[in-house]
Amino acid sequence: MSQRRQIGAVGAVVAVAILTACTAAVGGVSTSGDPQTSQGTNTTAPTPYGESDLPTDEPTGSPSRSDSPNPVPASSNKKIKRTFQVKTKDPVFFITIDDGNTKSPAALEYVQKHNIPATVFLTNASVAGQWDYFEKFAAQGGSIENHTMSHKSLTSASTPLAYEICRPQEIYAQEYGRVPTMLRPPYGNGGYSTTTPKRRKEIDAVASSCGIGHIVMWNGLAENGKFRFIRGALSRGDIVLFHFTPTLSGELKTVMEMAKRRGLRPAPLTDYLK
């Protein structure tokens, strides 16, 4: 274990974020990067779309490299912010990658070669002991953030919120020497207005109790090699959702080509969501 990982877990707060998976009526973009249609215009609260579930045979947890993860101390509650896109004048966009099921050497090589700061929203059930892979993936200025223990919907009454949100805080702090500050909820459930006020408050209370300050949504999606954007094309401040799938390396190449044509560059989300 590296010296940085031996630092142990820093105090963290439980973060709960909700992402709903529906199909959005937004413009599609082919892998060539050319917009096919431009229907979506709401940049503050887009229609939820784009989140997939884990395979049904996915394990419910991944063993930590440490025998005794340090507990994350509780901290004072703070208001959880939900972000669909970043308001900035900088010519930047944000690459965010969910789950962790496929550990593609080609995708890792691409982000390393091009020094891409990726924000990894890691599901603990997907790690399968390959902690180093995700550490290397985020080492170009990115970060490893929280996508729950086992990808359960946070709006389901049967989902134990503290376990799904706060337990990864402890594990990732132990493994990576940093407590996540962002949560991306599976399926987007809880991030949109479809969540009941009561459940939203419950999620926010748990998330804020263990260090989460932001529930990060998205307004752009890469899926099966194609792209969709709420604003019709890749734009300044966009948060683009990717998944660790076999098509990831090609999708990263495509979005970087789009960005070059539009005068944009990828930036670390941690630089803009404090």
Residue spans for each PLM region:
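Bacterial signal peptide processing site
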Residues: 23-26
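Catalytic domains of cell-wall/extracellular-matrix polysaccharide-remodeling enzymes
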Residues: 153-260, 264, 270-274
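C-terminal motif of bacterial Sec signal peptides marking the signal peptidase cleavage site
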Residues: 18-21
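Residue-level detector of anion-binding/catalytic polar loops
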Residues: 117, 143, 213-214, 265
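N-terminal export and membrane-targeting signals
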Residues: 1-14
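C-terminal domain-boundary segment and adjacent tail
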Residues: 36-42, 48, 52-55, 65, ...
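Active-site beta->alpha N-cap acidic-glycine motif
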Residues: 61-161, 171
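Hydrophobic residues in well-ordered beta-strands that form the structural core
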Residues: 120, 146, 216-217, 268
